Amino acid sequence: MFIEVCHTSGIWLQDYLSSSNLSLMKKIIVSGLWLFFLLLSACNQRANTYFEKKLTYPDILTSDQKVKLAAYVIPTQQQYEWQQLELTAFIHFGINTFTGREWGDGSESPTLFNPTDFDADQWISSLQEAGFKMIILTAKHHDGFCLWPTRTTTHSVASSPWHNGQGDVVRAVKEACDRHEMKFGIYLSPWDRNAESYGDSPRYNAFFTEQLTELLTNYGDVHEVWLDGANGEESDGKVQEYDWARFYHVIDSLQPNAVKAIMGDDVRWVGNENGVGRETEWSVTPLQPGISEATAIENKRLNISPTADDLGSQDIIEQSQTIYWYPSQVNVSIRPGWFYHPEEDHQVKTLARLVDIYFQSVGMNSVLLLNVPPDTRGRLHEADVEQLRQFGTYIGNTFDNEKLIDGDIPWKARSGASREYNIIPDESINTVMLQEDIRKGQRVEKFIVEGFIDNKWVKLTEGTTIGYKRLLRFDNTSSSRLRVTINETRDIANIHKVGAYFASALEAETEDLHGNETNLNSNQIK
């Protein structure tokens, strides 16, 4: 899909056409292609062509031209609005909450599900006060227990004693979200250890499609559908071939504004469950979305996977045939487990750890998905709520107090370009934020930030990618000015905003950055 915007740029093609090693026929072909793009743009009296979500390269492009053209791949409106959320919350709640397990086997009795003081408004208000903008509810986990009274199975809240079988967790949570103006998403596990049809691919795909249809039809707007890749072959020995194309069609038809995450083609998994993004995080990547034979073949050819360190470098782009706007989501739990376990009440992540996670997710061009599991009462535990409160207060106190006078003025930067900013007099800083206008692509490959100290420029920090947002911390410093230099960029970079802040010191985190978490394979994320 081609999107026309207001700034003219045909440099990559001009360079291409002037190269001496191309045949006349190839130049004619490319000239024709570019003329076609310009005609498309002229329909709206605009001259620059961007590629929304996906670009397949013509075979005749050189490596350098591929890299330059990657700078013109942009997000869809849904992807852009999703990225702006920054903070989202996972709610793992279900039969596992009452059995003490992480993965149920589907044999659990629905009578076990009986929260004693269910309060969805408490969930949403606690998360909203901490700055979260969307929640994703586990409507069904791998055990197959459904949190809504589905027509597809009796393994649901309708068979539980909660509200005498008349309750609907999905509806209660969605209505609470609406009351608090919180966006709502669903997690629906394709792997179902209770469904009799699981392993009979056509039958189960119809079963799953019906469940998906119920959730996307009966509860109003849904903003994200989180599709897990676990399929249980190793656990149960049943081989189920999911009809992903069918599932995508249902989502796109019933909830066109929702992003499809993880096994979907709008949002990708960062590759670990530790709350740690990449130092170099490209939203433009040749990583093929989803799980299919063609996807596996191409990803293997490029030697990339969701867990790879490099998903978007020039070397990877040069080898690719198709590239995607496929941004990263960082998922991690506030506790060791994903579901509530009372023995973990004293293992809730510290404020220092939560702040680190924020800098290593939102601050590394990703969206954070922080899991906060309700307890057997049906409430967020007081320990979790207190840490959320402290986290929200800390982030607000830090980033609501801008120290730059003129950081919100957008600018365009070629490689080597700099801009200076004035710092409010007598203010100390130790944190910097940079943002690109990703509606015009992600382009910056390397930058440096300096402070004017003792009449000379001193390096404070440096980095590689920026993307939607990059946050960097450094030692406390008092400087009258800040200078940002874009050392390397794939094309003219569109710097949307630069900010400088002072973050209060926190007690050092004693555990290793990665804790005791385990990296998982991409097809067994949860």
Regions found by a protein language model. Give the residues of each.
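Bacterial Sec-dependent N-terminal signal peptides
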Residues: 1-51
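Mature catalytic domains of secreted/periplasmic carbohydrate-active enzymes
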Residues: 47-453, 458-474, 485-496, 501-504, ...
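Surface-exposed, short loops/turns at beta-strand junctions within beta-sandwich domains
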Residues: 476-478
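Short, conserved beta-strand segments of beta-strand-rich sandwich/propeller modules, principally
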Residues: 481-483
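C-terminal functional segments of enzyme domains
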Residues: 509
